Regions:
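Cytosolic catalytic domains that perform sulfur/thiol-centered chemistry
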Residues: 7-287
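Sec-dependent signal peptide recognition
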Residues: 1-4
Length: 287
């Protein structure tokens, strides 16, 4: 309890409903060696050149299986083995970070919550803020002892393509698109067969909730206005999609941060990689 209260202090000043979902750099610098804290570096590159002390590296690709339709999730057994190898137990406080404002870290947050582990936070500002403040780094590779980790029923949900089809133009579900305008317009295909967007989806670019310089999250009032202006109500069921589930996870994390009911948040994890490569999925090409 003392640990949670301490890490909440900085985030509380920004007005977040769930300040425990973020830790700041000052807090982390004081808790690098805490026995029950596991720091996870999710940057695609750079870990070997230097990282936050005590951080273990996780390949973000390991938490999505592109061949596992319709959910695209690693199996419970695969996820248990992955967390165990990182030294994460069911009581571990996980702190995730990357160099892109949480785009990779948020996907770990989402899948941990999906598999029943809610004791996870993002480092606000991530590697960008940590490095800018010239905080300690090293290139040592920790070797944590494997610890038992068991999945259980979580809060957030995964949506399948069939469920998304059913949600098109539905009054019971808000469908958000976390991708760039170029992707939505169908001009930026990113190796996908077809471009465009899902009918009735609302553009909600993931990075618009971040400070453009520090990559830290904007205050709660600004984030709430961002989603309110998109027509997202506090009690709405929300499904978010992007290309491979990362940017969608970031939108979901941000909604959770400002107090949205986690049981009403879903990630279409097949994402545009599935939707745009299928021939039976309806696609719009103009907003």
């Amino acid at each position: 309890m003392a640990l949670l209260l301490a890490l909440m202090l900085g985030a509380q000043s920004a007005g977040y409903t769930r300040p425990e979902l973020l830790v700041d750099t000052a807090w982390l610098a004081q808790h690098l060696t805490d026995a029950n804290v596991r720091i996870v570096d999710l940057r695609p590159r750079g870990y070997g050149d230097g990282h936050i002390p005590e951080a273990v590296w996780l390949d973000n690709n390991a938490i999505r299986n592109a061949k596992a339709a319709p959910t695209f999730l690693p199996t419970p057994q695969e996820f248990e083995a992955l967390m165990s190898k990182l030294g994460i137990s069911n009581t571990t406080r996980v702190i995730a970070y990357d160099e892109r404002g949480g785009i990779y870290a948020a996907r770990l947050w989402w899948i941990l919550n999906y598999y029943g582990h809610s004791n996870v936070a993002l480092l606000d500002g991530g590697w960008v803020k940590w490095a800018a403040e010239q905080r300690a780094t090293n290139n040592a590779t920790p070797a944590p002892a494997a610890t038992p980790f068991k999945v259980k029923a979580g809060t957030v949900k995964v949506a399948t393509a069939d469920q998304v089809k059913a949600a098109i133009n539905s009054s019971s579900m808000k469908l958000l698109d976390a991708r760039t305008q170029g992707e939505i317009d169908g001009k930026d295909l990113r190796n996908i067969k077809r471009g465009g967007f899902i009918e009735s989806s609302i553009p909600a670019y993931w990075e618009d909730t971040l400070d453009p310089v520090t990559k830290a999250f904007k205050p709660a009032a600004e984030i709430a206005k961002f989603y309110r202006d998109k027509g997202v109500g506090a009690n709405d069921n929300v499904t978010v999609y992007c290309q491979v589930g990362m940017r969608a996870s970031h939108d979901l994390f941000t909604l959770a941060l400002i107090g949205h009911d986690l049981t009403k948040l879903a990630n279409y994890y097949g994402a545009w990689e599935e939707w745009g490569n299928r021939d039976d999925t309806p696609i719009k090409t103009k907003q």
